[in-house]
Amino acid sequence: TALKRVIDMAGFVGSPLVRIMTPKKEQILWGLNGAEKWNVAHGAWDAQLPLLSPAIDVAKQAGIVLAVETGNGTMVNSNYTGRRLIDDLDAKDNLKVLWDPANNCWCHETAFPDGYNEVKDGYLGHIHIKDVKVDTPRATLEVRQMGEGQLDEQFRLLANALRTDNYNGVVSFESVYHTGNGNFEDGFRLCIDRFKAIFGK
């Protein structure tokens, strides 16, 4: 299978993690006080569990950890849903959250303290960082230069918490910004010093 091939590649390069994504997102998964009757996408969450369970078994056999990314168009689009997936699959040893705080902005999960508190107790596998400005009502996402998006102050608080809590995983920079000219290398160079200043040792 494709997953087994990727796990083999991870072993070859010495990666302890393999990234996975969950299926396309339904907007409302749970509800109360009438919403459970009229608004919830019934069965959408539970339907993904038997789809993902075999992947957990493959990871266990291979001795590797899967990292489910918080994607803005996926069923796991927040650290809350990432943690819930891990708990529902009883897979904390072989499934972690690959946290993209910028993606979580789309569902309005505040990176710090809310997002961090969901995953800090053994659920966090990897973090990758970019800065953004989201406008959910207009269905618009803008990647911003580090420090010019909506996450700058939260990044500082998060970095301090990671140091305080002795996080020993990787925090990587996701280089997806350009100034409008399509040149991602220039965008990288405009962002990397600020990234290192915040998240470096």
Task: Show the residue positions of the predicted features.
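Residues that line or immediately flank small-molecule/substrate-binding pockets and catalytic motifs
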Residues: 22-25, 131, 174-175
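Active-site acidic/histidine proton-transfer and metal-coordination neighborhood
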Residues: 1-97
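Gly/Pro-rich active-site loop or hairpin
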Residues: 75, 79, 83, 103-168, ...
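C-terminal helical cap(s) of enzyme catalytic domains, especially alpha/beta-barrels
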Residues: 182-201
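Hydrophobic alpha-helical membrane-association signature
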Residues: 2, 48-51, 154, 187, ...
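Conserved, mostly hydrophobic/aromatic
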Residues: 10, 66, 82, 100, ...
